[in-house]
Amino acid sequence: MLTSLRTNANIVPMIGWSMIDTLIRPELLAQVREEISSIAGSSAKGSDIGEHMPKLLSNPLLQSIYSEELRIRNGVIIQRVPVVDNFKVGNWKFPKGDMIVTSTWHEQRDRSVWNEGPNMEHSVEEFWAERFLVYPNDPNSGPGKPGRDTKFKGRVGGIDEEGNRPIFTTDSVTGSYIPYGGGTKICPGRFYA
């Protein structure tokens, strides 16, 4: 029972927020309906949807909406214990065995990391359904702030098999997008979410 509760700890609120954020934005709702209809057909019933689930789950827009909800609505506490003495993080040194506790909340809202749109119209504090999409021939799209120097180089422009649709990526925000924690203690349920 406890395992099933933990399994739903993120997915249920994120589905709820995804629905709310989609329903209050008529243009986004129309886009989502179009994406679902293009995959499952306009007359698909709830019982028929299972056969279309792999394509729905890999749809770039739906993935971006879910990832954006995790970014903006979810904060994870990460605990670590250094196994070496004088373990350094930034300007701080920690002795071996002391617990380090941090939150993903700030990192997932860091303006120096995240793309806020070409005219800064999509604040890191607000939901933006397309934040995780990279459009063909648009070097300013994608989750990472354009021009930001990072050792994790994301795609400059993404293309799907046909070459005309956006792709979903988290490449340019590796290390800052950590909705499931990380390391050996990363959430084992992340593959089910």
Q: At which residue positions do the language-model features occur?
A:
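Catalytic or ion-translocation cores adjacent to nucleophile or general acid/base/metal-coordination motifs
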Residues: 28-43, 54
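Conserved cytochrome P450 K-helix E-x-x-R motif and the immediately C-terminal K′/meander segment
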Residues: 42-91, 101-112, 167-168
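Generic, well-ordered alpha-helical scaffold segments in large soluble proteins
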Residues: 18-25, 35-39, 65-68, 72, ...
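Conserved cytochrome P450 K-helix/beta-meander segment immediately N-terminal to the heme-binding cysteine loop
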Residues: 102-167, 192
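Central I-helix of cytochrome P450 enzymes
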Residues: 1-35, 189
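Cytochrome P450 heme-iron axial ligand motif
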Residues: 7, 166, 172-193
